[in-house]
Regions:
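Conserved N-terminal alpha-helix of the aminotransferase class I/II PLP-enzyme fold
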Residues: 7-54, 76-77, 81, 87-89
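Active-site C-terminal subdomain of aminotransferase-like
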Residues: 103, 127-135, 140, 177-280
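Conserved C-terminal alpha-helix-loop-beta "cap" of PLP-dependent enzymes
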Residues: 68-69, 258-332
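PLP-dependent aminotransferase-class I/II
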Residues: 92-127, 131-136, 141-148
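Catalytic PLP-binding core of fold-type I/II PLP enzymes
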Residues: 141-171
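Conserved PLP-anchoring active-site segment centered on the Schiff-base-forming lysine
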Residues: 64-82
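Hydrophobic beta-strand scaffold residues
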Residues: 95-96, 160-162, 272, 299-301
Length: 333
């Protein structure tokens, strides 16, 4: 989904926004309309800040929520921990503490075990729990799992952030509206992605906890995430939300992942590494099979020790492509 292009309706919206001039830095009608789209999802009391980059959205959110003496508790597979080049540590100056996960998810019980040194002057103080929805291995937290984690976090004075780079895929997988497993469960802030689901380059920070709204616009600028021509970020979101395009895109991607998993199930030379719950399929394969397949297709081996590969499906992945790919996998046996 990182390699796919832009949905035609999003591209059309960009072209329409590219006519004439508009006030910069978000003082334009497109940004106001996009913010209204978010309020329609989450309620009028939320605050939304559009940004160009996913890593920037996460780091900006973290930087507003905690201080340098805090630690962020996250899954050992969390993108913010493994794949953002130390951006959190460099910008926020805090420690990332990974918690062993099961299929990419942490539990309330596992979280509790990391809250034993609260108040100690010798240790970084846990200040934030960072969740990813859907996870880095395409699994999905249930509302019950999120609520349990939020309850433990808040009871111990920690805030909760959700990295929603693929939040649409999670919403489709759960079959419920996005507010019901974020704001309504007490999540304090989230990154709301779109780039991986048919947009060109736009993300957003959605703030539920009003304590974090003050000075956010200034921090966004200081953290290099204030776009001058904001209307081009906003126009994408307007098209993205119109007529449920964001859910339609995610539903197709999820369905293609399920189709691929079904087609390769039973093949003796491949093994599912994680449950297929959104738009990714992770499998264990022999090194020679990986090498042979990579000569035809572009994909990554994400866990070399287990020879686990990652196949992500997108809004524009066709059923024919999936069946052709599955046939190539079958031919390796």
């Amino acid at each position: 989904d990182n390699t796919s292009g832009v949905h035609p309706k999003v591209m059309e919206a960009l072209n329409k926004a590219n006519v004439g001039a508009a006030e910069p830095y978000g003082d334009d009608p497109w940004t106001a309309e996009a913010e209204g789209c978010f309020k329609a999802l989450f309620g009028d009391d939320v605050d939304v800040f559009l940004v160009p980059l996913g890593t920037g959205a996460n780091v900006l959110g973290f930087n507003r929520m905690i201080r340098s003496w805090h630690s962020i508790l996250c899954s050992d597979m969390a993108h913010t921990h493994t794949s953002e080049s130390g951006a959190v540590e460099a910008v926020v100056g805090c420690k990332m503490t990974p918690i062993p996960s099961v299929h990419g998810k942490i539990s309330a019980g596992a979280l509790s075990a990391y809250l034993t040194d609260m108040g100690s002057p010798h240790h970084s103080q846990p200040g934030l729990v960072a969740l990813t929805q859907s996870t880095e291995v395409a699994t999905v937290y249930t509302p019950e799992e999120i609520k349990a984690i939020v309850d433990v976090a808040h009871a111990n004075g920690l805030f909760v952030h959700m990295d929603g780079a693929r939040i649409a895929n999670a919403a489709v997988a759960l079959g419920c509206d996005v507010r019901s497993f974020t704001k309504d469960l007490g999540v304090d802030m989230m990154s709301f992605g779109g780039t991986k689901n048919g947009m060109m380059m736009a993300e957003s920070v959605v703030v539920f906890n009003k304590d974090f709204v003050r000075d956010f616009v200034t921090l966004r600028k200081q953290n290099l995430q204030l776009a001058s021509k904001m209307r081009f970020l906003a126009a994408q979101y307007i098209a993205y939300f119109k007529d449920g395009l964001w859910l339609e895109n995610a539903r197709h991607a999820n369905n293609m992942a399920r189709l691929l998993a079904d087609l390769i199930s039973g093949m003796p030379h491949v093994e599912l590494a994680h449950p297929v719950e959104s738009n990714g399929v992770f499998v264990n394969m022999k090194p020679e099979h990986i090498a042979a397949l990579q000569r035809q297709y572009m994909f990554h081996e994400v866990e070399p020790s287990a020879h686990t590969v990652r196949w992500m499906l997108s809004f524009n992945t066709s059923e024919e492509q999936v069946r052709t790919f599955a046939k190539a996998i079958g031919a390796l046996a």
